[in-house]
């Protein structure tokens, strides 16, 4: 099976991509473009010559190659992004029958498939936040935005969290009512949102089309009347599908965020739990989501279509920002009204920043593991670690498992503080001999980051996120070249251990 990456790699050359028969099966390549092909391509656009047999045969051969290539590419998209994402890419990205698959079309179709599949590395995680949006196309088609907080980390399904924030008016609005404040209505889940985003007329046409195709399949095409043949041509478009209750709905664009703290892949319940340092604060978001719902019950909050604070997009953004989205990307409010398109763009920016930082964090982790491959570095670091267990975060797990007593929590914070001081002192000692011509800009940046980003018990989630970001990005700039000495390697390991202390403080901050 040819991968999406293989198509993208060939398309980067800017020419038409084709699928041919290789020694080991179908293979993707760039179409041959010699003098003959260039001549026929030119003649196929000349009115007086394009109907010549030779030119027509060439044009038909190209269209056949393009159709086959598109079919294989859609199969590759389906394997990577699922049938729904591949169908969306075909519906919105393929356009003309027999059109060439070039760099622009490959990029466009991959982008569409990603949007329908969902964007974000947190999609398989047990603890995640999902931001959903349906495109706004003006007041007649305003779209929608909603947010769901999910926690399926516990083995007991009865303790799973599913908090859905979906802000609607209690009746259909139109005209001047778009500026009025009306009573709000909260939807219970994503499935109800999907049903609400498909019109009654479209739903009726989809049902008629499905029924007509079933009848034609059972009775035969020659027995179908004109109305049935007409209805049978009405197929669902990308995103339109039946749910398990046989109700039609329209799928949303989805953006996935990880929750800060211990997390794991929900597809592998026996897999290891890892601490996610960069993400959203689940507890803070749950508090705000419940405050919003309580405000709807008491009448404190209303729904207003044209609003910066009380429409669907602004409410979804409010809960997203309550989780710390602005720790990653500053938020700028709309001048007149928030809308699902702006909300989606902001959610994408936050997701991209969070995923990039978590990827850098993983890169630093792997680099430090390689540094410990040196016997001398490993021995020196083991001696330091055994003296104070500085290289890990053993108490962070305890903090993440529930609320501890005030005395236990304070003892834990005091131990974290002692480790921070010990790591800082070790880093300063390792840096003492690096002065003058032996100290370059990278050394100075790392020393400055260690000084400014040492965590403390006074730090909240925002401060800890900022400090972790600076340390991770500073260390990330050191990964391209091997350290020149054991001392440099140990300095990097000390900085990595400081990130471990930030994790420990973060676990306490989100559990408090």
Swiss-Prot record:
Chain segments annotated as coiled-coil in the UniProt record: 347-374
UniProt superkingdom: Bacteria
Region (Disordered): 388-415
Pfam families: SicP-binding
Transcription in keyword set: no
Secretion signal span: none
GO-annotated cellular components: extracellular space
Compartments reported by the entry: Secreted
InterPro entries: Globular_prot_asu/bsu (IPR011070), SptP_N (IPR015203), SptP_N_sf (IPR044899)
Similarity comment text for this entry: Belongs to the BopA/IcsB family.
Known function: Plays a role in mediating bacterial evasion from the host autophagic pathway.
Protein name, as recorded: Effector protein BopA
Gene that specifies this protein: bopA
């Amino acid at each position: 099976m040819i991968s999406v990456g293989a198509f993208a790699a060939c398309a980067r050359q800017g020419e038409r991509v084709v699928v041919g028969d290789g020694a080991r099966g179908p293979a993707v390549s760039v179409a041959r473009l010699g003098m003959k092909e260039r001549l026929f391509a030119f003649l196929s656009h000349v009115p007086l010559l394009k109907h010549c047999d030779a030119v027509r045969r060439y044009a038909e051969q190209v269209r056949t190659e393009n159709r086959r290539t598109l079919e294989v590419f859609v199969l590759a998209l389906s394997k990577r992004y699922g049938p729904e994402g591949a169908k969306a890419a075909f519906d919105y990205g393929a356009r003309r029958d027999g059109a060439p698959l070039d760099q622009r079309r490959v990029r466009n179709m991959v982008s569409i498939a990603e949007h329908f599949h969902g964007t974000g590395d947190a999609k398989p995680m047990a603890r995640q936040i999902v931001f959903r949006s349906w495109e706004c196309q003006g007041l007649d088609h305003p779209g929608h935005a909603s947010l769901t907080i999910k926690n399926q980390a516990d083995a007991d399904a009865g303790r799973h969290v599913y908090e859905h924030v979906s802000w609607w008016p209690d009746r259909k609005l139109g005209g001047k009512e778009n500026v009025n404040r009306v009573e709000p209505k909260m939807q219970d889940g994503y499935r109800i949102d999907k049903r609400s985003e498909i019109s009654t007329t479209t739903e009726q046409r989809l049902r008629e089309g499905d029924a007509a195709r079933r009848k034609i399949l059972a009775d035969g095409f020659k027995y179908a009347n004109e109305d049935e043949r007409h209805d049978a041509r009405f197929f669902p478009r990308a995103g339109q599908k039946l749910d398990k209750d046989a109700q039609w709905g329209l799928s949303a664009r989805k953006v996935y965020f990880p929750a800060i703290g211990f997390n794991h892949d929900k597809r592998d319940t026996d897999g290891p739990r890892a601490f996610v340092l960069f993400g959203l604060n689940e507890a803070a978001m749950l508090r705000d989501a419940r405050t919003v719902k309580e405000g709807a019950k008491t009448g404190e909050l209303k729904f207003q279509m044209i609003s910066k604070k009380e429409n669907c997009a602004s409410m979804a953004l409010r809960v997203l920002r309550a989780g710390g989205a602005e720790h990653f990307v500053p938020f700028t409010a709309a001048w007149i009204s928030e809308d699902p398109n702006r909300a989606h763009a902001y959610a994408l920016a936050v997701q991209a920043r969070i995923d990039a930082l978590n990827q850098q964090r993983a890169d630093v982790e792997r680099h430090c593991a390689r540094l410990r491959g040196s016997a001398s570095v490993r021995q020196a670091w083991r001696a330091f670690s055994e003296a104070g267990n500085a290289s890990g975060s053993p108490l962070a797990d305890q903090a993440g498992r529930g609320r501890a007593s005030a005395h236990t929590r304070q003892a834990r914070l005091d131990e974290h503080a002692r480790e921070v001081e010990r790591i800082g002192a070790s880093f300063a000692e390792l840096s003492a001999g690096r002065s003058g011509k032996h100290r370059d800009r990278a050394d100075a940046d790392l020393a400055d980051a260690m000084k400014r980003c040492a965590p403390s018990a006074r730090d909240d989630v925002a401060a800890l996120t900022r400090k972790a970001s600076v340390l991770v990005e500073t260390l990330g700039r050191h990964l391209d070249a091997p350290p020149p000495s054991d001392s440099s390697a140990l300095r990097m390991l000390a900085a990595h251990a400081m990130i471990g202390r930030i994790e420990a403080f973060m676990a306490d901050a989100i559990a408090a």
